[in-house]
Amino acid sequence: MTYNNQIRAARALLGLSQGDVAALSGLSVPTVKRAEGQGVIAASSDAIAAIRAALEASGVEFIAENGSGPGVRLSKRKAGT
């Protein structure tokens, strides 16, 4: 499961704007804003998948909730390139 705070954190980690993420994912800026909103994510699962794929392709790894909570980090694969 991807959480809205993970999307915001991944975008910030990469230094991307909501417009950048929209362009990378092929979605609109309002859709990205809904995905990052507080509370329940108000974007479709397809939109979340597209955003996540775009952020992962840009060098972020999503960390599953494993007792310590969900998170994001820079991917080792991208960090060395």
Segments the model singles out, each with a brief description of its role:
Residues 12, 23, 56:
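Short polybasic/polar patches that bind polyanions
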Residues 9, 23, 34:
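DNA-binding alpha-helical recognition surfaces that contact promoter or target DNA
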Residues 26, 45-62:
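DNA major-groove recognition helix of helix-turn-helix/homeodomain DNA-binding modules
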Residues 7-20, 76-79:
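Short basic helix-loop element that most often maps to the first helix and adjoining turn
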